[in-house]
């Protein structure tokens, strides 16, 4: 599944995992992306990948 929101274009964040011995390895934090059926126009729905912060903010009308 894509790790990019179709509404706000939020993508993964990158950084390092730091172990107890301070070894650093690359990692990424993915946004919480959900596949939902969203209403694009009245009577017209399509599947979209939307982050949960957009769902919670009401930026998407589920249909």
Curated annotation (Swiss-Prot):
Disulfide bonds: none annotated. Gene3D superfamilies: Ribosomal protein L28/L24. Pfam families: Ribosomal_L28. The keyword Ribosomal protein applies. Coiled coil: none annotated. It comes from the Bacteria. The keyword DNA-binding does not apply. One of its GO terms (biological process) is translation. GO terms for cellular component: ribonucleoprotein complex; ribosome. GO terms for molecular function: structural constituent of ribosome. Keywords: Ribonucleoprotein, Ribosomal protein. NCBIfam families: L28. HAMAP family: Ribosomal_bL28. This is Large ribosomal subunit protein bL28A. The lineage of its organism: Bacteria, Bacillati, Actinomycetota, Actinomycetes, Mycobacteriales.
């Amino acid at each position: 599944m894509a790790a990019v929101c179709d509404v706000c274009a939020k993508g993964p964040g990158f950084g390092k995992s730091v172990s107890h011995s301070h070894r650093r390895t690359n990692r990424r934090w993915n946004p919480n992306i959900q596949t939902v059926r969203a209403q694009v126009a009245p009577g017209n729905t399509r599947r979209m990948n939307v982050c949960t912060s957009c769902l919670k903010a009401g930026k998407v009308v589920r249909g």
